[in-house]
Amino acid sequence: NGKILFKNQLYNELCFEPNDANVDTFLVYDVVIGVDFHWQRKENQTFKGTLRFVVEQDNIVLINTLPVEEYLLSVISSEMSATSSISLLKAHAVISRSWLFAQIQQVCSSQAETLSIEGNMMIKWYDHHNHLLFDVCADDHCQRYQGVAKVTTNQVQKAIEETYGEVLVYQNNLCDARFSKCCGGVTEEYATCWENSQVAYLQSIVDEKQKEKKLDLHTESAITSWIRSSPTVFCNTSDAHILSQILPHFDQETTDFFRWKKVYSQHELSTLVHKRSGIDFG
């Protein structure tokens, strides 16, 4: 009947709070990670904080509530590896903290429509519209948050403590510090990737030391040449030592992360467009 049965009682929601938030943990079995990615799998994960079970249609949603800095301990150890250098972990802490606060701020202030139709063109932006019951999800759609077992080194705690509360700010506004592990050698502008608006600090840049270098990738021939090349940029590395230090083990399984290939049949493309847009083009 759409309720949770617990100790012979029916509930719409259950909440379990720790007796000692510093020590008590709970274990969740078969958590799906990498949803819809090629490396999707299940993990048993251990968490701290409050656990809520909430009914949403035919599903039960598990929501973990905890302090931001505790959350970030897991994030910087799940997105990357806890064995990363202290400098990388500190930078990641500031970036992930900034991104989190920016998302919460946007949800609180935004009433923007995600779908617009202009002539024969339909534009739909996908972001945090799936998360109505909680601030952020625990997977790659937002930030990986895979529990306390990922925090395997003392330098993770040190990175959080030494950057406590630090965020990125641009012109007195909190930065939406979106990030990825690999950009393919050049980043995309915010307006053509996430939302139809300009963000001054999220512009297209080449992933190398020469900050003044510009790439014009606005033509078919230019982008084809770029994709088929193997430029000397930061994220184009096959150094096994570096990768084993900074990447979680399942990320290391993918060796062609810089240049990769995916083939779709006509039917698969049609199905994908229909699923995303709601329009059947045949």
Feature annotation, model-predicted:
Residues 1-282:
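Conserved, single-site charged/polar hotspot
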